[in-house]
């Protein structure tokens, strides 16, 4: 019997192969079975982001965080969506929250460096991007 976890794994496999439309379908099926599956929700949001649908992705991450406010991956991806939407101050705040939960999250550190670069703060950008190399 297929369950939400099955479709989440299928979504992850499709996402890893950069088949974002397929991953979106699989995550939607997972969420149809279990609407509170935070892993499928984050995968769905990431797929939407990969398809350039950043506003929609942001809404998915916000919904995920209502289910689990301490899910650092949802926070990190919300920060990335905010960055794509040029909401840089909000992105830094959200990425800081993700880093409180998981201080060694190299992706969150990298995204924070990217945000600072986009804000024109090259000193902080270099710090966070080079921190990723340590």
Say what each PLM segment does.
Residues 3-33, 49-50:
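Alpha-helical segment of the N-proximal tetratricopeptide repeat
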Residues 16, 50-51, 84, 118:
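Register position in tetratricopeptide repeats
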Residues 4-5, 38-39, 72-73, 106-107:
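Helix-start (N-cap) detector for alpha-helical repeat units in TPR-like alpha-solenoids
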């Amino acid at each position: 019997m297929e369950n939400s976890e099955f479709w989440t794994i299928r979504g992850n496999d499709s996402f890893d192969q950069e088949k974002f439309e397929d991953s979106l379908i699989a995550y939607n099926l997972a969420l149809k079975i279990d609407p509170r599956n935070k892993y499928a929700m984050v995968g769905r949001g990431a797929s939407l982001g990969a398809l350039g649908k950043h506003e929609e992705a942001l809404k998915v991450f916000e919904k995920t965080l209502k289910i689990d406010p301490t899910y650092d991956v949802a926070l990190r991806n919300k920060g990335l969506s905010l960055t794509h939407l040029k909401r840089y101050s909000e992105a830094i705040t959200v990425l800081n929250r993700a880093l409180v939960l998981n201080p060694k999250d190299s992706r969150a550190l990298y995204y924070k460096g990217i945000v600072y670069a986009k804000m024109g703060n090259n000193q902080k950008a270099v710090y966070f991007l080079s921190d990723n190399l340590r």
